[in-house]
Amino acid sequence: YTLPAKDVADFVKLVERADLTGLPAIDAVSSARRPLLAYGALVLDELIKRGKPRAVIISAQGVREGLLHEQLSEEERAADPLLRAARDYNHLRARDPRHAAELIAWSRAILETAGLAGDEPSPRLIESVCLLSDIGWRAHPDYRGEQSMNVIAHAYFTGIDHVGRAFLALAIFHRYAGLKADSPAANALRALLPTPILDRALLLAAIFRVAYLLSAGMAGLLPRMPATCVDGRLILRLPEDLAPLASDRVIGRLKQLAKLLGRDYEIARL
């Protein structure tokens, strides 16, 4: 949890002075720890004054997690915790876990040829959202978007901040529910995202909506149907034996994706 240092300094001053019984949500703090709050606030206040940090990062982990982390091998410690968790979800919940690797490459080809392969969101977030893109397939179609969004918003992921988590959750919400779908929970997550990151979440959702309609989540198909941006057009290339996949639904979603990219679309033969 990352907060501006000024916000933390203002809060600890409030805790130092306030009657604890009057603080909102004080019931969330155990009665045994409440008498120590003012002392902890004083220490944190002094740390901020002396260290002059721009931001304060509060770990979501605790002593027990740290003890377990110390017992891991160096190789395990070096692993990216977010990608590890996303791969686990993909392995446990996707129809065909092999499909995610192909989707990563397929999505990157579109982003790179569209000139959108920048640093925001980071490549690891792009990879993670691809790995999480099929976790809701077992749910009823009417609820897949909302359920998948809630799973990601509350999952025990580490190595990710609030903006990154909201990006993942909203991209998968719109992948299932549609690009114009809405809900109170989705609105709350949108409030966390800068406009460029929200736009990228919608773009990834649009890419997934085309990819899954073409591949049904099965490995071995997307590499045979490359999609790239060339000379102001989004071009989907289909081999002769897969040409019947160019249904009205696929064309509609391809047109929607091309619009987000600011391009025309074309379906060509390989």
Each predicted region: which residue ranges?
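Short secondary-structure junctions
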Residues: A216-L222, L260-R263
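A structural detector for beta-sheet-dominated domains
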Residues: T228-V230, P239, A268
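Short, non-transmembrane amphipathic alpha-helical segments
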Residues: L245-Y265
